[in-house]
Amino acid sequence: MNTKSIRFILGWILNIEALLMLLPVATAVVYREEEGIAYALVMAVCAAAGALMTYKKPNNPSFYAKEGFVCTALGWILMSAFGCVPFMLTGEIPSFVDAMFEMVSGFTTTGASVVLNVEELSHCTNMWRCFSHWIGGMGILVFLLAVLPLVGGSNMQLMKAESPGPSVGKLVPKVRFTARILYVLYVALTVLQVLVMLLGGMTFYEALCTSFGTAGTGGFGIYGDSIAGFSPFLQWAITIFMIAFGVNFNVYFLLYMRRPKDALHCEEMHWYLGIIVAAALMICANAYDVAMTLEGNLRQSFFQVASIITTTGFATTDFNLWPGFSHGILVVLMFVGACAGSTGGGFKVSRIVIGFKSVLAYLGAFLHPRVVRKVKFEDKDVDGETMRAISVYFTAAISLFTISVLLVALDGFDLVTTFSAVAATFNNVGPGLGVAGPTSNFAAFSDFSKVVMTMDMLLGRLEVFPMLMLFYPPLWKESIGEARIRRNRSPFH
């Protein structure tokens, strides 16, 4: 394994994180908050560590899938570890387990929180929490690819390891330009939302924090009631933007290239929008509140469905109080998730649809054994390798999810709380049901359960395999063997 290349890229991740910490520092300056000193200190340490790790560029630029997985997993852990330090230095989240949980929740765009009252946090800390969603939404490594020429051959491996969905491809021939296009679209949509939020009456600080949380489909808020205190106009606007950020960004690229027919022909988007409309109407009928207008009921239903399926996690109502049927729909949506190639989490609509079509094809084979039935998606035959990858992903994800539920169950909470809390963290949704519901948080769980769910958030955001690779013994045995061979070949040995 090429450890020097991994070290080099991890160093650049710290350099980028140091640069990004300028925003909470600037926020502290604007609001004259002493907490900004902690962010400035950590920013300096990040920059120093990054400079040391990138001082010498690796001579051997070879970089393969295993390095991509390891670098991605270590990068997210390292970024979260440095990012959580200001929480402890300011005393706002003094426990390392809690601070790490909060920061991982931010970067993985989960939005699950252990903070009892977010309104008591400093402006700079709330800005950093919300900004972490925006950073993690598209991915720190995709940002790195957009702005820096990395070691040879590493670009596609890093993008595959970090990008959500069953496959990742290039929008243009060079991966670096693909990353740039993705970020230009991401920034453009974010700026558009900020402008709409300002138009709806938000302050610039509120608009920026809310837009960061929406764009990254994260869900950290700056008020205890999340989005409930804002006007109906803003709630509808946020609903639309949540849905928009849950769409595959290839669709926006096609629109930018003036190919609207190709963009609107996206099968995954059709399923995604259809699921949203169907789920919202069913919840509206099931949880209809006669004390509210039809518009109010529709607004709450569409908002919560959009929030859960895109794994954003904002709330305008306490859906803990909804009937059991509505709870069931929300839990299913947690697993379905948004589109591949979006900033959303979950299993992804494309995987669910391909899996559903595979079951139908398998059943059809029993009726007509001699007929070759191929699974089609986006007007193309799904190849065997993609089918195998999806099956392996489902098996690994469900197995890890089950283990996590059993471990968190040791806390003694009811099954609804335990199951939904793990589902909310594994699928990067944020709020669950019961004790982990939208009006509560995850502070009541033990440190052990918080560590388990912190791992779940990383597993879910990186789609299992990069994190699993860190615990795969043959990888490290092979790396140790390669190191011994290099040492034996050294003229100084």
Please identify what each model-predicted range represents:
Residues 1-493:
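Membrane-proximal intracellular helices of multi-pass ion channels
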